[in-house]
């Protein structure tokens, strides 16, 4: 039964990722006053399926000088971790109801760094290695702020469990009292998923394609799926943390529908940002984090720790 549940979670995620690629191409197309893909199927709806067939039927090339086992393992690990991160997410019920769901997601996203590092190192290409080192530095840096912001939100919620957040936000979305945290969280998720304007790892002008430059066909598709699964995942967490979802036990469909709509709107915002902003310079990216976000998030975290301690000493006003 667990296997059936697992498949019922994985297959929709992969389908969502497939159609997110189409949505991205269509959105960017219309923002640049053109149509986007419209040949394969009605209005280009079958384009992702055609792309998948093309990629998975190509010959899996690998460089002669590469470390074979690592080269093959890296994309598999990337996708496995991207899909594993979904397990504690309440939609409205999680696949595994974890007591420390937030901690699990943080740990899994930290492990994703290894797949990037392996792919860059095993490719035995200078472009791939530079891209991988950039990606690792960027991901590790922005995880610091993500963890501190999560801690601040969890202090308001009072629990590490994700379903508790919907109970916390029954009367008021957390984005309203904690909007600076929400803004910093959103920008950090952009950087964490290597999206524009922080897509320095795949800077076409200087690094060809970043850490996946030597990958082709199926293995490239696995990295691609992992990247887009992480984008949807991050937006789903943003929705759960800040755009509270009212859970009515008699109408679980309502929760799922509102969750889906909010996540979709957040994802479209990601695409909109990609169409609008140029790429950051690498030093600007690091300055933004270490000199702006980190002091701010630490200050806000201390604020959220001190307020309950301060108010605990006030006697109840009866």
From Swiss-Prot:
GO terms for cellular component: mitochondrial inner membrane. Its main location: mitochondrion. The chain crosses the membrane at residues 2-22, 70-90, 100-120, 140-160, 172-192, 217-237, 253-273, 294-314. PANTHER family: NADH DEHYDROGENASE SUBUNIT 1 (PTHR11432), NADH-UBIQUINONE OXIDOREDUCTASE CHAIN 1 (PTHR11432:SF3). Core subunit of respiratory chain NADH dehydrogenase (Complex I) which is composed of 45 different subunits. Keywords: Electron transport, Membrane, Mitochondrion, Mitochondrion inner membrane, NAD, Respiratory chain, Translocase, Transmembrane, Transmembrane helix, Transport, Ubiquinone. It catalyses: a ubiquinone + NADH + 5 H(+)(in) = a ubiquinol + NAD(+) + 4 H(+)(out). It is a multi-pass membrane protein. GO terms for molecular function: NADH dehydrogenase (ubiquinone) activity. The keyword Signal does not apply. Core subunit of the mitochondrial membrane respiratory chain NADH dehydrogenase (Complex I) which catalyzes electron transfer from NADH through the respiratory chain, using ubiquinone as an electron acceptor. Essential for the catalytic activity and assembly of complex I. The gene is MT-ND1. It comes from Emballonura alecto (Philippine sheath-tailed bat). Belongs to the complex I subunit 1 family. One of its GO terms (biological process) is mitochondrial electron transport, NADH to ubiquinone. Its EC number is 7.1.1.2. InterPro entries: NADH_UbQ_OxRdtase_su1/FPO, NADH_UbQ_OxRdtase_su1_CS. It is found in: Mitochondrion inner membrane. This is NADH-ubiquinone oxidoreductase chain 1.
